[in-house]
């Protein structure tokens, strides 16, 4: 058994130590693709012994999203390196600490094409509590680990790709009980950054799909604003012990740009504004972000 972690990243220097903390100990190797980061992401990964590959794609989607295409390359790299099992977490995720000691034993029991399906905990404006209510941000499960079957391919969609190769069915997925381990998703923990990224996604998607997609995009991303009657559950300390975290506030009411973790997002948005005009995007629900609202009202 050779376990390889596969990760695409772009400007994730703040989260990569978090990812590495509980992914590296269960992997024999990690292979990453750096999608043109302009921060210290690549150095952090290389210093940790990760094999980092660059990525060039002449058919890059004009909305600026290449993650699904990169995942295809990652599975090829993993196979070339002799991987039998692939761990597919993103940079703003890591495993709960209680999963680490049992992870390899669980993976060793998988048949070719089988996957470990784990609960995906949305840490909402917090690093110690996960969302637990009746919204789409609760009780989510996802395929994060797969034993390779070389007859399988990877499929993706624009900004909504899956993680592992092959179909997700009752026959291919083994669901891990929450008390044995889960995946911590820190995307929502640092809320200004979450909202900025969602605005970046919406604006990029409108560029990619055109004005006719306004209603579709607003409907799709309305779930990012579900703030009423939020239910939260505190995690046991043993789930999160020894996990390093970004040193920024969970929410900054002043929206100070020094706390923006991905330095490309705001410049990317401004570039679209310059190319298309701010009015092109006026019907999107992104203007709660002060920097964008200022551009609209200028």
What role is predicted for each listed range?
Residues 82-94:
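Short beta-strand-to-loop acidic/aromatic patch adjacent to the donor-nucleotide binding site
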Residues 28-36, 91:
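Short beta-strand/loop segment that forms part of the nucleotide-sugar
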Residues 2-4:
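Cell-envelope/extracellular polymer assembly enzymes that use nucleotide-activated donors
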Residues 64-72, 97-298:
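Catalytic-site signature of metal-activated, phosphate-bearing donor transferases
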Residues 27, 83, 111-113:
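Short, high-confidence coil segments that cap the C-terminus of an alpha-helix
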Residues 11-26:
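Short, well-formed alpha-helical segments that are part of the catalytic scaffolds
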Residues 34-45, 58-59:
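A conserved acidic beta->alpha catalytic loop
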Residues 68-85:
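Active-site nucleotide-sugar/metal-binding loop of Leloir-type enzymes
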């Amino acid at each position: 058994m050779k376990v390889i972690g596969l990760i695409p990243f772009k400007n994730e220097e703040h989260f990569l130590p978090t990812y590495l903390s509980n992914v590296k100990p269960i992997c024999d190797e990690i292979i990453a693709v750096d999608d043109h980061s302009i921060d210290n992401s690549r150095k952090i990964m290389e210093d940790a012994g990760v094999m980092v590959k660059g990525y060039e794609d002449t058919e890059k989607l004009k909305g600026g999203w290449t993650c699904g295409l990169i995942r295809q390359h990652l599975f090829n790299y993993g196979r070339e390196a002799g991987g039998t099992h692939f761990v597919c977490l993103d940079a703003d995720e890591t495993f709960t600490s209680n999963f680490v000691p049992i992870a390899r034993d669980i993976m060793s029991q998988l048949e070719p094409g089988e996957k470990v399906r784990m609960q995906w905990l949305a840490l909402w404006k917090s690093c110690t509590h996960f969302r637990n209510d009746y919204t789409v941000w609760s009780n989510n499960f996802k395929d994060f680990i797969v034993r390779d079957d070389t007859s399988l391919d990877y499929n993706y969609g624009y900004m909504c790709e899956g993680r592992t190769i092959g179909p997700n069915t009752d026959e291919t997925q083994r669901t891990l009980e929450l008390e044995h381990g889960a995946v911590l998703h820190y995307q929502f923990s640092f809320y200004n950054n979450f909202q900025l990224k969602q605005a970046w996604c919406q604006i990029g998607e409108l560029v990619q799909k055109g004005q006719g997609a306004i209603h579709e995009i607003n409907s799709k991303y309305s779930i990012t604003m579900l703030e009423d009657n939020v239910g939260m559950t505190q995690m046991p300390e043993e789930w999160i012990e020894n996990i390093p975290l970004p040193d920024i506030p969970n929410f900054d009411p002043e929206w100070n740009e020094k706390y923006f973790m991905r330095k490309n997002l705001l410049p990317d948005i401004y570039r679209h504004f310059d190319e298309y005009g701010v009015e092109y995007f006026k019907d999107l629900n992104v203007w709660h972000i002060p920097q964008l609202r200022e551009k609209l009202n200028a």
